[in-house]
A protein has these predicted regions:
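Terminal alpha-helical segments
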Residues: 1-109
Length: 109
């Protein structure tokens, strides 16, 4: 496996791991473990950047007139995973904020 296929799998692997980290961060926040949640967001961000950089490399290669990407289900899946991970991060950050507010209200009661 090389070229486009390898890059697609790199994207899928990295952003899939990022998405999993964001989902785990929600679980940590639900247990009021905000340090753990924030650590998982950071881990997810690192993996997301790895996937994003691989994707950007494909775009740059095509823009420079290199061998164009062939649109395949694999590349579509990689881009879908990239966008999904980005959405999960947004959701995870919102959930963490909500759980922080729940904890604060609980302490005030």
């Amino acid at each position: 496996m090389e070229g486009l296929e390898l890059t697609a799998f790199q994207i899928i692997s990295a952003v899939g791991t990022a998405r999993s980290s964001y989902i785990e961060a929600i679980q940590k926040a639900k247990a009021f473990d905000f340090e753990g949640a924030e650590a998982l967001i950071k881990e997810g961000d690192e993996m997301f950047v790895e996937g994003h950089n691989a994707h950007a490399g494909l775009l740059q290669q095509e823009a420079e007139g290199g061998p164009g990407s062939t649109l395949s289900l694999l590349i579509l899946h990689a881009e879908d995973q990239l966008m999904s991970a980005e959405g999960f991060k947004t959701i995870a950050l919102e959930f963490i904020d909500v759980y922080k507010k729940f904890e604060k209200i609980g302490k005030e009661l």
